[in-house]
Design a protein with these regions (language model features):
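Surface-exposed acidic/polar loop and edge beta-strand patches at domain peripheries
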Residues: 1-310
Length: 310
């Protein structure tokens, strides 16, 4: 881990304290007064792109009693109008780490669940996020850790597909399922179907759209103004996932896009926890991956990066 050049500082976020982690390649801002939330991620070289994350306005209204705020958050799945939207407005327990920070919210009164997030800088362009849900209630809870990253609009997302098989060579069975939500319209130009990936042209979404997938190479990417954000969470073979088996989901409404990964479903007894790990990468200078050639370049870059994590 090459973290000796990481800087750790504090700043204000909407009247509350936040922590800033800075390397040569990026600056990350994490709230400590509410959340846990990662509210900003900027590239040093790609400063034109600004904050890659969506930031809701200061006068944001609550959504089902919950401030979305923007950025990256931890929820518990399956989605429920009461359980999922518990407010996270209280100050956090904060533990500084040599290469990052660990954060934990107070236990949610209505669910008995406590959310925690550990953020570690692995090198100048790589982050490791460990999400945890702990059951402090009186009975077992079936749930999954759900890591959602809200990225600002104007860009292009890619979801790689599994390698193609050959019918002639005896590949007779399916390898994954595509799971659209009830409001998803697959005829819209927001979806770009390619042989090796699905492209999502965010500005072309004029209403809420969402789909999930039951198996994929474990990474997704979002390109905006020359900066590419990648998140990686490998699929656990044989595990049962929420939402008809989805370890990955994507939501967009044209103003933003959410790249979402999930842990397997688990039944948490009182005192038990489930963890879910994502790795993030920030890359500059790659082309918009809307063509097969540009996607191939992105996939090669991401492949090398993933190998460096092991």
């Amino acid at each position: 881990m090459k973290t000796k050049n990481m800087k750790h500082s504090k700043t204000d976020y909407r009247g509350g304290e936040a922590v800033v982690l800075t390397t040569k390649a990026f600056t990350l801002t994490v709230t400590t007064a509410v959340g846990p939330r990662v509210v900003s991620l900027t590239s040093t070289a790609g400063s034109k792109a600004g904050n890659l994350f969506l930031q809701m306005p200061d006068n944001e209204k609550r959504y089902h009693g919950y401030y979305l705020r923007g950025g990256h958050r931890l929820w518990h799945s399956p989605e429920d109008i009461v359980r999922t939207y518990q407010p996270d407005d209280s100050p956090l327990a904060v533990k500084p780490l040599k290469n990052g920070i660990a954060l934990a919210q107070p236990t949610e009164d209505k669910t008995g669940l406590q959310k925690a997030m550990k953020i570690e800088v692995l090198d100048e362009r790589t982050l490791k996020l460990t999400h945890a849900l702990t059951n402090h209630g009186l009975w077992a809870v079936e749930t999954a850790a759900w890591a959602l990253t809200m990225l600002r609009g104007g860009g292009y997302a890619t979801l790689p597909l599994l390698p193609k098989g050959s019918h002639a060579d005896g590949d007779l069975l399916p390898s994954y399922s595509f799971v659209p939500w009830t409001y998803t319209d697959l005829s819209l130009p927001v979806w770009n179907m390619h042989r090796d990936f699905i492209g999502i042209d965010v500005p072309k979404a004029k209403a809420a759209q969402k789909f999930g997938i039951t198996n994929y190479p474990g990474w997704s990417a979002y390109w905006v103004e020359g900066v590419t954000f990648v998140k990686y969470a490998p699929v656990i073979k044989g595990a049962t996932y929420p939402d008809l088996g989805c370890p990955f989901e994507v939501f967009t409404n044209g103003e933003m896009i959410e790249l979402e990964t999930l842990s397997p479903l688990v039944k948490l007894a009182p005192g038990e926890s489930v963890t879910h790990v994502e790795h993030w990468g920030v890359f500059d200078g790659l082309k918009k991956p809307s063509t097969d050639a540009a996607f191939a370049e992105l996939a090669a870059t991401v492949g090398k990066w993933i190998k460096s994590l092991k």
